[in-house]
Amino acid sequence: NTNPAPLLSVVMPAHNAERTIKTAARSTLMAMPANAELLIFLDACTDRTRQELEAIHDKRLRIIEATNQHGVAAALNALLAQARGRLIARMDSDDICLPWRFRSQLHKIGKTKADILFGNAVLFGRSLRPFGLLPQFPIRLSPQQGALALLLTNPFVHPSMIGTAAAMKVLGGYRETPAEDYDMWLRASLAGMRMERSAGYAILYRVHDNQLTQQAAWKQKLQKDNSLFKTRADLAHALLGFEIPMESDLAIVSKAIWSDNRGGLI
């Protein structure tokens, strides 16, 4: 490509997203600066996802299409390989990008010198009662707080992310795991990268009944992911000097961190 490299590449994998892709793409393009690109990976789509995108006439939009299904991690790695920006941001094909997102995030990542920066999300969907909206608490997480929170849960909303292309390269992209985002944040923290979450809202995050992370099969695969739990154990050793239980129960893990027999962290 002979055009100058953009400042920002936004990557979006999509599989059969005909009902939501146009809104996701348009809201992202509206929020992006002029010197940015939106890369969308069509992962073996069999519906009208491509036709919906072809109705959008914007030179910043690039479509990559695969006939064989890759899955999220492989699709994201294919997008990272094509991205030309110094900064990389994520979006999902069923979410909505808020208009101020990139203006705010570009300012903050430059100011904080973070390797990876996240925003907060407003959850939306018919299953959320009574109004269909549920904002996350607008709380900032410092790099130190974020690293500790990773031992308890995944505190970061993946499609709210913006990070440096250099950081993505050092991490080697995404690994094939049920929780490819959580795995990457654990590895980034273990590598000493500066990750933080700003208090402001970046996206509207769609919640629906057939969400992958709510399915029993996905949860079973996650429990068997030894590589992820090893990375989590390594991070616990690096931060705390002791292991934490494998149980996912928040109270058990919190007790292990704050009530260590050497006095914990306080």
Predicted regions and their residues:
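Cell-envelope/extracellular polymer assembly enzymes that use nucleotide-activated donors
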Residues: P6-S9, E37, D183
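A conserved acidic beta->alpha catalytic loop
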Residues: L42-Q51, N68, D92
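Conserved donor NDP-sugar-binding/catalytic core segment of glycosyltransferases
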Residues: W100-G132
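N-proximal low-complexity "stem/linker" segments adjacent to membrane-targeting elements
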Residues: N1-S27
